[in-house]
Each structure stands twice: as C-alpha cells, then as structure tokens.
Amino acid sequence: MTAKKLVMVGYTHDTNLGDQVIADSAEYLIKKNIIDNEFSVERFNLNYSNEFNSFKKLKRKVINKILSRLSSSSSFDYKVGCYKRDYKNKFNDASAIVFAGGGMIKFKYQDCWAHISALVDTVANKPCPIFFNAVGVEGYDQSNYKCRLLKESLNHSAIKMVTTRD
C-alpha cells in the first residue's frame, strides 16, 4: 500500500526560532502517532516561491515595490497567482496539509494572506483537508482587503481545524 502524503507547511526558515520549534514538535508528534506508517510527512517552506526567486538580480523588496505601484487588486492577484503556480504540483497528491506554527494569520506585515489564499484555491476541489496548528493571530481589520481575503480563505470548507497559540 502506498503511503498517504501529509504536507507540513510553514515558515520553517524564518528568523523566528519559535516557529521552527513548533513545526519540529508537530512533525514529531504526527510521526510518533502514525499507525503502521500509513503516512509520509513532507515539509514545505512557504517563504520560497519559484517565481519570486527566478528574478536573478532583483530582490523581493524590489518586486514588492513594483507591485505596490499597481492597483491593489492587480498586485494581490499577481502574488496569489505566483503562489498558486508553485503549489499546483507540490500539493497535487497530498492527502492532508498542516500549517505547523508560525504567525500564519497575518495580513499587515507578511504575505500569509497570499500563501493561505493560494493554497486553499489550489486544493479547493480536491479531498485534501487543511489544518492550522498553533498559529499566531494578529488581529482583524474589515477595511483591509488582504484581511477580508484571509477571512474568506479561513472559512473555506477545506479548512477543518484551527488551533492558536495566543
């Protein structure tokens, strides 16, 4: 029997070491409690994007500066589209996805909203549940488009559970 693939996603190469500890702990607990090796656990770092990294001499800040001059919806659509293209093949055969730790539910200072939106859109039509484990929560601002997009994604039927550390 082929093992089912559980993908653990997060910001595992972030400077916040607490996020890495939470991800390591979650992976340990999952592997410890898997019965008969039914699942393989694979990690995916959300800080990585093929499209953003394909610009050899441009740094992400420069790309974001260019995007900031576009209309908000064009900029947001571009970012989400980049991540969706990255995720299309990565999560195609995933049986479940776990966001392990991190300040995932953020919209002001990081692209969590874009990562989460792209991931939910990518697996929306597949039987692949998404779980959020020990995530940090930043707040909510109804007037912020990114926050509303994040709220919409978190309320999608693919999201099965959210636990917070706050």
Which role fits each region the language model picked out?
Residues 2-154:
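Aromatic- and Gly/Pro-rich donor/ligand-binding loops
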Residues 18, 159-166:
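A short beta-strand/loop micro-motif in the catalytic core of glycosyltransferases
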